[in-house]
């Protein structure tokens, strides 16, 4: 299987690109095992310096596959992409007291391989699938009529209120009313205190003094 994949593949490489391999691998991991069309879209929308380098390299690999090997561009997949360390350029930055700090300018080597992978058609995928038995339809259950429940008797916790019947007022006879009116002034006269006559006492005192 591996030999078949490599026999229908094309490669492209570029060396000594002025970029750190650690930063370039971040973009390379995005397109690994992706189709060629998906990889192109990812690289065009990724805002990284390495995306421009890898995009040119991928277009070169696709052109090699279609022109040199006669492969179908729609079936190409990025089966391998490598980013290796290139030669490091050493520079120095001068500092005070005669000191010099080193500067390492790293470079990277890129390698990419695209292979033609024949994806199984829809008919092959359906033929391999086992035919599932049709699911049994559940038998319709006969629903029993719902029995009417007897209403619950509510037990009231309130105590029964005793109603006192008001007795009807007895109307007095007109004769009794007149007798009551006559009796009232007589009773009022008896209640009034009788004033003693002071004239008699004064006259007796005067007679005694004489």
Swiss-Prot record:
Q: For bias kind Low complexity, which ranges apply?
A: 158-185
Q: Which family does it belong to?
A: Belongs to the universal ribosomal protein uL22 family.
Mind listing the GO molecular function terms for this protein? Answer: rRNA binding; structural constituent of ribosome
GO cellular component assignments: cytosolic large ribosomal subunit
Under the subunit heading, UniProt states: Part of the 50S ribosomal subunit.
Q: Tell me where on the tree of life, at the top rank, the source sits.
A: Bacteria
Q: In UniProt terms, what function does this protein have?
A: This protein binds specifically to 23S rRNA; its binding is stimulated by other ribosomal proteins, e.g. L4, L17, and L20. It is important during the early stages of 50S assembly. It makes multiple contacts with different domains of the 23S rRNA in the assembled 50S subunit and ribosome. The globular domain of the protein is located near the polypeptide exit tunnel on the outside of the subunit, while an extended beta-hairpin is found that lines the wall of the exit tunnel in the center of the 70S ribosome.
Q: What is this protein called?
A: Large ribosomal subunit protein uL22
Q: For the region Disordered, what residue ranges are annotated?
A: 123-210
Q: Name one GO biological process term.
A: translation
InterPro entries, alphabetically?
Answer: Ribosomal_uL22, Ribosomal_uL22_bac/chlpt-type, Ribosomal_uL22_bac/org-type, Ribosomal_uL22_sf
Bias type Basic and acidic residues, positions? 126-157
Query: Its encoding gene is what?
Result: rplV
Database matches in SUPFAM superfamilies:
Ribosomal protein L22
This chain's source organism reads Metamycoplasma arthritidis (strain 158L3-1)
Keywords, comma-separated and alphabetical: Ribonucleoprotein, Ribosomal protein, RNA-binding, rRNA-binding
């Amino acid at each position: 299987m591996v030999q078949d994949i490599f026999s229908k593949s094309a490669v492209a490489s570029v060396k000594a690109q002025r970029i750190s391999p650690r930063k370039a691998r971040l973009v390379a991991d995005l397109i690994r095992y992706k189709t060629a069309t998906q990889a192109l879209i990812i690289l065009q929308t990724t805002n990284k310096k390495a995306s421009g380098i890898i995009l040119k390299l991928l277009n070169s690999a696709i052109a090699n596959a279609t022109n040199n090997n006669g492969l179908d561009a729609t079936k190409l997949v990025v089966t391998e992409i490598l980013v290796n360390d290139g030669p490091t350029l050493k520079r120095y930055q001068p500092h005070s007291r005669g000191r010099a700090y080193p500067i390492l300018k790293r470079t990277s080597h890129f390698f990419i391989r695209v292979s033609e992978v024949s994806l199984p058609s829809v008919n092959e995928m359906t033929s391999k699938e086992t035919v599932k038995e049709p699911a049994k339809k559940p038998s319709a259950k006969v629903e029993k009529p719902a029995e009417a429940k007897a209403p619950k008797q509510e037990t009231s916790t309130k105590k029964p209120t005793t109603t006192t019947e008001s007795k009807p007022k007895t109307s007095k006879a007109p004769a009794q009313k007149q007798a009551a009116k006559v009796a009232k002034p007589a009773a009022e006269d008896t209640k009034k205190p009788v004033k003693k006559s002071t004239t008699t006492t004064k006259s007796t005192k005067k007679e005694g003094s004489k």
